[in-house]
């Protein structure tokens, strides 16, 4: 119960950050997808949340952290171009889905109560 409340709050924060553009779209979508899987797998499969799954799957082969730094510049640029294309294609839908999570799918924040 406590963990679910914490996960819901983390999801609300991530969705807000994605909407406020405080977080890169791809990173935000991946984080939301992973948290949704832990919070409520059924909600994660909801059609309104599919964009997060799509962005996760489209980028899961991309190296992260030290492996990213180890890539040569042309490889990094190729991945960055892919990110830009994905962002253009999915930004509006990801923003709508984040707004839906905040307004309808997730319990209201304790602060708002």
Task: For every predicted segment, state its role.
Residues 1-113:
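Acidic, Ser/Pro/Thr-rich low-complexity regulatory regions
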